[in-house]
Regions:
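Catalytic core of pol beta-like nucleotidyltransferases
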Residues: 1-23, 31-37, 46-97
Length: 97
């Protein structure tokens, strides 16, 4: 995984400020240590984080880990279970804990 422990903690902390019960996954190229570059792809499974909170969440994450390209998907558990793209992502994703 090409995300430092400190970055992972900061991301998780920022998301959990909005929903303590959420699950946060890193997916995409940052999961593979052999690949270079790439943005930070995050999947958040939350019943509380809505569309309006997503922008403020991105701003907060960038404040904590620095300006980086971040793709943020936020889905409810039901949406995630019904979405084949999300199911594909989760097969290789790493959950931040």
């Amino acid at each position: 995984m090409r995300l430092s422990v400190a970055e992972g903690r900061e991301i998780l902390s920022a998301v959990r400020m909005l929903d303590a019960d959420c699950r946060v996954f890193l997916y995409g190229s940052r999961v593979d240590p052999k690949l270079a570059g790439g943005d930070i792809d995050l999947l958040v499974i939350s019943e509380r984080i809505g569309f309006s909170e997503r922008v403020s969440l991105l701003v907060e994450i960038k404040k904590r880990i620095g300006e980086q390209k971040i793709d943020l998907l936020v889905k409810t558990a039901k949406e995630a279970a019904e979405n084949t793209f999300i199911q594909t992502i989760k097969k290789s994703a790493v959950e931040l804990t």
